[in-house]
């Protein structure tokens, strides 16, 4: 009986995946996939135009967040909750 209970406890712990955190793409010097800090379980992609928008295209920011950011005028924001669900648009073409 003790072995059965111990087995159930071990299986339960393995199935819970304790301490899981989301992985998101983040922008910086280069685009990388990183584990998000605890409490930041969403990935986001924010785009907007700056003064170079006509020649370079929209600015793209990727990262982790606890809540989806509020959209400001002339910004577009998308949020998602699975690992690396916020790839840079050019990465999707590969």
UniProtKB/Swiss-Prot annotation:
Coiled coil segments of this chain: none
Keyword flag 4Fe-4S: no
Q: Which family is this sequence assigned to?
A: Belongs to the three-finger toxin family. Long-chain subfamily. Type II alpha-neurotoxin sub-subfamily.
Q: Which domain of life is it from?
A: Eukaryota
A GO cellular component annotated for this chain's UniProt record is: extracellular region
Let me know which tissues express this protein, per UniProt: Expressed by the venom gland.
Location in the cell: Secreted
Give the primary localization class.
Answer: secreted
Q: What function does this protein fulfil?
A: Binds with high affinity to muscular (alpha-1/CHRNA1) and neuronal (alpha-7/CHRNA7) nicotinic acetylcholine receptor (nAChR) and inhibits acetylcholine from binding to the receptor, thereby impairing neuromuscular and neuronal transmission. Recombinant LNTX1 leads to a functional block of the muscle-type acetylcholine receptors. Has a cytotoxic activity.
The record's listing under Pfam families reads: Toxin_cobra-type (PF21947)
Name recorded for this polypeptide? Long neurotoxin LNTX1
The record lists the organism as: Ophiophagus hannah (King cobra)
Secretion signal: which residues?
1-21
């Amino acid at each position: 009986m003790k072995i059965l209970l111990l087995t159930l406890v071990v299986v339960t712990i393995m199935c819970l995946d304790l301490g899981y955190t989301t992985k998101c793409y983040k922008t910086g010097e280069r685009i990388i996939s990183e584990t998000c800090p605890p409490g930041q379980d969403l990935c986001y992609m924010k785009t907007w135009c700056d003064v170079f928008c006509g020649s370079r295209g929209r600015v793209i920011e990727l990262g982790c967040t606890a809540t989806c950011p509020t959209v400001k005028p002339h910004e577009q924001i998308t949020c998602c909750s699975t690992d690396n669900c916020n790839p840079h648009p050019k990465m999707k073409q590969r």
